[in-house]
């Protein structure tokens, strides 16, 4: 698809004639379809004086309104590049179709003349943003957009109806605030549960604290006992060392006293024997002397 002549890119003139002869092309696959292709398709309905292509949509400006309406009637819902086109008159208001999650009011399509009189056309001005947003909404619809999952509906309890009869037989209905009571009961029960949980946590913490204190006390006792035992062993060892030293000193003293006593006895014995021998010699000599005589 190729166009014969190159047209202008201006499609945003605000005069009534231009707006009424302008065509909006939505759901357009602009990645494949180019400006020359659009001109080739829509030029058969009349002379095109302007064509502007944007991301996902385009505008075609005709010379007359009759040509624009013929293009809308002939090309709307045509499938190009795998997507059905959404073609409308750009200068006419469209019926607003609310979408899920969309809160754009119908007044967003047009603005009053008093706000922007220089863009007014018959009391209103055209809003290009609306066409762009509406185009993207319909684009998701064509591709089978899955609607968001419905919110879980919480069944509400029906309020109890108490029938009180009077003597005349007329029934007087009184509605009890069941929903209020349920809400109040749920809040009170929730606060009660929280307080109970806090109490249980407090008890558990106190139990843990007592256990830790008892363990610390036991450790202190064990440390004291071990320290006392170590001191006793050290004292006993010192006493045994002192006893051994005393015994060694006493033994040395005994040996030193015994040695001089033994030396004196030996000297006396020698002297005694020497005297006896002398006496014996003297006596023996005397006897021998007598015998010789």
UniProtKB/Swiss-Prot annotation:
Keyword Ligase among UniProt keywords: no
GO cellular component: nucleoplasm
Keywords, comma-separated and alphabetical: Coiled coil, RNA-binding
Disordered as annotated region, ranges: 171-195, 236-293
RRM domain location: 21-92
Ranges of compositional bias, category Acidic residues: 239-249, 268-284
Coiled-coil blocks: 192-255
Residue stretches of biased makeup (Low complexity): 176-192
GO MF entries: identical protein binding; RNA binding
Family statement drawn from the similarity comment of this UniProt entry: Belongs to the RRM HNRPC family. RALY subfamily.
PANTHER family membership: HETEROGENEOUS NUCLEAR RIBONUCLEOPROTEIN, RNA-BINDING RALY-LIKE PROTEIN
Name of the protein this chain belongs to: RNA-binding Raly-like protein
Classification of source organism: Eukaryota, Metazoa, Chordata, Craniata, Vertebrata
